């Protein structure tokens, strides 16, 4: 964890069609929480571009016209929990990116990804995805402002403590929101810098992008994500796998939330601690099996707890209903046709590539390899 674990490397991108790639020097770290364990041999990685190694940044359109062209870091992610390298036959390589692509199609901020074959020291290492890192530099690239003015919140999983941390800036503004309550309209509207009647106030501060929060929660609910932003593995008492970003000097936007590491989603069958098609993330506070959602203190404060507090307000519930109707009907981003289109687009991108993944990792944990047909 940190710079001490970074190793100098050379990185080359080669396109099969012969189009221009790049060759640069950089730093490499193993990325992730549980996936860093030696029991998972594939690992995910993070690339850093620093003047220590050569160019201070990577200048290349990694995501074409979809994204920016300058990066100081980029993730190389891979499936872990349900992957062949981990001995699990439920590998799809689609779950995580599906949630992030859905945020995109809801016209919300999101992190971009592309599939690649990775060779490590000349040895084929399998299928990976580039992924943007939703941190201050990322926010500055897409929203402007100054990197030092951004607060970025995530969950620190070191030593399995699963506590909120500011990976950039500080958590002061998030703590202010933690101490708010929203049952009255005056309290609710203050979250958007409005008066008790819902009218914008001069100099009023937007604390949270409400539509973004609702759309984020719709993705969590629709995909049955039982590991974000609170985790079934910890009886829904601790936070996990979310990013929240706010420019503390810009009063017009407020915190926005990003789907992250959404592997624990879209299962048909039930298995501990998941309920498959019966996974209900909407009513976590009502569970009676000891896994009801709770937040004991600020260290565990996450977007779903904020959403839960907001549901005490009639105006918020009406707004949630309107956003749900927008996305679940009339060709919206959560209608069946759009969902299938989104999933099929990614499936086509790796339909053949997964054969190489099978050859590399299909027999990592068993004698008979998993294959594309699995």
Q: Which residue stretches match the model-derived regions?
A:
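Conserved ATP-binding subdomain of kinase catalytic cores across diverse folds
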Residues: 1-164
């Amino acid at each position: 964890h940190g710079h001490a674990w970074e190793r100098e490397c050379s990185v080359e991108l080669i396109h099969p069609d012969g189009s221009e790639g790049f060759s640069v020097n950089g730093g490499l770290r193993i990325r992730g929480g549980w996936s860093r364990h030696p029991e998972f041999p594939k690992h995910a990685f993070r690339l850093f571009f620093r003047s220590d190694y050569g160019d201070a940044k990577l200048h290349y359109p990694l995501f074409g016209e979809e994204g920016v062209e300058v990066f100081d870091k980029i993730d190389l992610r891979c499936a872990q929990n349900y992957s062949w390298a981990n001995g699990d036959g439920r590998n799809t390589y689609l779950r995580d990116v599906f949630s992030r692509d859905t945020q995109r199609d809801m016209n919300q901020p999101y992190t971009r990804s592309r599939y690649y074959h990775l060779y490590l020291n000349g040895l084929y290492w399998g299928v990976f995805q580039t992924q943007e890192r939703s941190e201050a530099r990322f926010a500055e690239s897409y929203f402007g402002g100054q990197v030092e003015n951004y607060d970025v919140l995530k969950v620190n999983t070191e030593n399995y403590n699963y506590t909120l941390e500011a990976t950039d800036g500080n958590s002061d503004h998030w703590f202010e929101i933690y101490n708010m309550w929203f049952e009255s309209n005056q309290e609710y509207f203050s979250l958007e810098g409005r008066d008790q009647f819902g009218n914008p106030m001069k100099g009023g501060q937007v604390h949270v992008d409400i539509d973004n929060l609702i759309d984020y929660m719709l993705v969590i609910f629709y995909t049955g994500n039982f590991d974000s932003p609170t985790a079934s593995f910890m009886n829904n008492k601790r936070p996990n796998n979310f990013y929240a970003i706010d420019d503390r000097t810009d009063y017009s936007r407020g915190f926005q939330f990003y789907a992250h590491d959404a592997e624990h989603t879209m299962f048909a069958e039930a298995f501990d601690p998941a309920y498959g098609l019966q996974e209900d993330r909407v009513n976590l506070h009502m569970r009676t099996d000891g896994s009801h959602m709770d937040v004991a203190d600020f260290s565990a404060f996450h977007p779903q707890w904020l959403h839960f507090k907001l549901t005490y307000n009639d105006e918020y519930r009406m707004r949630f209903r309107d956003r749900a109707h927008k996305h679940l009907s009339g060709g919206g981003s959560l209608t069946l046709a759009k969902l299938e289109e989104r999933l099929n687009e990614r499936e086509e991108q790796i339909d053949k590539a997964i054969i190489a993944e099978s050859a590399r990792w299909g027999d990592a944990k068993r004698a008979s390899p998993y294959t594309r047909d699995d």
